[in-house]
A protein has these predicted regions:
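N-terminal acidic, proline/glycine-rich, low-complexity intrinsically disordered segments
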Residues: 1-21
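Glycine-rich phosphate-binding loops of nucleotide-dependent enzymes
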Residues: 3-6, 29-288
Length: 288
């Protein structure tokens, strides 16, 4: 049997044709990557149908025309706990802030039960059932714990006592120290106050930006337990975390962001066991 070598597949002794061959391989790889990305985008949009909150193709940043997010997608269904991990500067917090109307969205949309909420202010989103806890311990230090809770419910102060009781069910310490000034609390306790205050408006979805940041390992574990308990009350939670391994242990689904794009997505368990995710992200992020 005779074998004929294709004319365009030259050996290393023909550098010109070899360069053409390498260029074709690069082009084919780019086309395959683009096709895979397009397929994954369609799958994501199909899965996102009926989601409580959805971000579609977000290009967003802190200034008009300057993007930190580059076609980022995310969805969370009723009752889900969704995590966002990735290296520093990947756009994790920016994605959360884009959902809450705190950064400029240049292209794309944010939807809440299929209603476009892209251009709504933060206070309007709170009224629609979206809560947000920023990364810093956002408490009023000169106010008592109880007064901080009142600030959380100022838009709708009805039934304050009943709402506060629900918060105390999750964070018993807040009830025991309700008359104590927030400025005298530890970092972990302040984080509980911040989350409790966001819950006073009884949100349908709660956005948490690195709630374990700056806490000791023991307090981090407590925060993650509380986050899961909040979710188990029926609140949809989207959490950004630098402690990637711990985050993936509690979430239903996760997103890995890199350079403002979705690098990987899957269940928490699948991402935690994915060799590429482990190699590229979990090895360093687990220590952060």
């Amino acid at each position: 049997m005779n074998y004929t070598k294709p004319a365009d597949l030259s050996g290393p002794d023909d550098p010109d044709n070899a360069h053409v061959f390498e260029t074709e391989l690069d082009t084919n790889a780019e086309q395959l990557a683009a096709s895979h990305a397009a397929t994954m985008e369609q799958v994501h949009k199909s899965e996102a149908v009926g989601a409580l909150v959805r971000a579609d193709g977000l290009y967003a940043g802190y200034f008009p025309g300057v993007n930190i997010l580059n076609s980022s997608d995310l969805y969370a269904k009723d009752g889900e706990l969704v995590g966002i991990i990735g290296p520093n500067g990947a756009g994790k917090s920016t994605l959360l802030k884009a959902i809450f109307g705190l950064v400029h969205i240049n292209t794309g949309a944010v939807l809440l039960r299929d209603e476009d909420i892209t251009n709504l202010r933060a206070d309007q989103l709170v009224r629609r059932g979206v809560g947000f806890v920023p990364q810093t311990n956002n408490v009023f230090p000169s106010l008592t714990i109880e007064e901080n809770m009142e600030m959380g419910a100022f838009q709708d102060p009805k039934n304050f006592s009943a709402r506060f009781d629900k918060v105390v069910d999750l964070f018993p310490t807040l009830g025991e120290r309700r008359k104590q000034r927030a400025g005298s609390l530890s970092g972990g306790e302040r984080q509980m106050v911040a989350m409790g205050r966001a819950l006073m408006m009884e949100p349908n979805v709660l956005l948490l930006d690195e709630p374990s940041a700056g806490l000791s390992p023991a307090l981090q574990d407590e925060v993650f337990v509380r986050v899961r308990e909040i979710n188990q009350t029926g609140v949809t939670v989207i959490i950004v975390e630098q402690n990637a391994r711990r985050c993936l242990q509690i979430v239903d689904r996760g997103y890995v962001l890199d350079q403002g794009k979705n690098a990987y997505t899957g269940t928490g368990k699948d991402l935690a066991n994915d060799p590429k995710v482990i190699e590229l992200y979990l090895g360093t992020l687990a220590q952060a």
